């Protein structure tokens, strides 16, 4: 039975499952417009996910062929995965921020092993042990990369321009650029009175930027063709403060559940990351590579119990925090170390 929530005012959410993922599901939002329904995100490209998406729309009396457009908060496969199939069935347009569209385009054009080569180089540079790198090389040589999600994601045909209203007949939906989780992540501010007249300025489709009970992953290793040294954590914290100033009545995130008090949740996340950075400075009293730092950080389980793929995510997050400390002048690289070590200033 599809799980559908009516948020009022012509807005619904559908729970679309993510296979083999502790997040469980993506909340795909449906926005009624004068030209037909528009989806905010689409879910993972998987038969069961597609069936739930179609079933959820059916429960609302909407055929997939009725979908007018798709607005993507960011390029990750649990958000953008089914966009191409939606477009094939309905002829809907797909809109995304240019920075994430560029990642999608480069990923589609690259040979399948490019991303694994890049990841292996990055992990070696931060001190990953050889036995961790061997499976990456084996996967590349086996050709299994051809089946990984995101390699053939649909190319968007519209650009989301920060600060501008999207062209949605009868609705006021404004794009807010919130880089950090991805370079082109956007939140979407529905500038309309809350249907229950909750105090505040409209509602916010927050994607993965602002979640009620999870701190979104802020890491590196997103784009093999990156040409600048990004500071995703710095970008994320700046973006959080902008969202906190909106004063929205309710947040409609892409995971978990809707919630009020965006400003309070923003404060919690800002405090969390400041505590995290302060804790890392204590660990960096002794020079460490980002890998060794990740081994010593607090996660939701001991390092030895963290699955292989999650370790890659963890060390990318550790390096993102180190990069923020370096940019703040609170840590520095140790000259002559290879792999590079960092120490608190």
What are these regions (language model features)?
Residues 73-79, 97, 181, 185, ...:
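Histidine-centered divalent metal-coordination motifs
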């Amino acid at each position: 039975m599809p799980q559908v929530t009516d948020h009022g005012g012509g807005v619904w959410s559908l729970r679309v499952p993510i296979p083999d993922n502790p997040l469980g599901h993506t909340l795909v939002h449906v926005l009624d417009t004068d030209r037909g329904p528009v989806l905010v995100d689409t879910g993972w490209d998987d038969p069961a996910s597609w069936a739930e998406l179609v079933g959820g729309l059916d429960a609302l009396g909407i055929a997939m062929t009725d979908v007018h457009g798709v607005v993507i908060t960011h390029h990750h496969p649990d958000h953008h995965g089914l966009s191409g199939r939606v477009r094939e069935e309905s002829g809907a347009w797909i809109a995304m921020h240019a920075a994430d569209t560029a990642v999608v385009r480069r990923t589609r054009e690259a040979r399948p092993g490019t991303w694994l080569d890049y990841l292996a180089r990055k992990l070696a540079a931060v001190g990953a042990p050889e036995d961790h790198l061997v499976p990456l090389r084996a996967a590349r040589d086996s050709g299994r990369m051809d089946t990984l999600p995101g390699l053939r994601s649909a190319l968007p045909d519209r650009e989301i321009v920060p600060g501008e209203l999207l062209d949605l007949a009868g609705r006021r939906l404004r794009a807010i650029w919130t880089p950090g989780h991805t370079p082109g992540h956007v939140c979407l501010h529905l500038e309309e009175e809350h249907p229950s007249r909750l105090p505040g300025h409209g509602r916010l489709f927050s994607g993965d930027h602002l979640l009620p009970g999870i701190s979104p992953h802020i890491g590196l290793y997103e784009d093999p063709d990156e040409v600048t040294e990004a500071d995703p954590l710095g970008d994320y914290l700046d973006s959080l403060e902008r969202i906190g100033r909106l004063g929205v009545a309710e947040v409609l995130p892409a995971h978990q559940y809707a919630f009020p008090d965006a400003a309070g949740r923003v404060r919690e996340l800002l405090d969390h990351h400041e505590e995290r950075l302060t804790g890392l400075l204590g660990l960096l009293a002794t020079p460490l590579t980002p890998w060794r730092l990740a081994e010593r950080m607090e996660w939701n389980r001991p390092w030895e119990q963290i699955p292989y793929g999650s370790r890659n995510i963890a060390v990318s997050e550790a390096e993102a925090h180190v990069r923020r400390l370096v940019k703040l002048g609170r840590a520095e690289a140790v000259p002559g170390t290879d792999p590079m070590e960092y120490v608190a200033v």
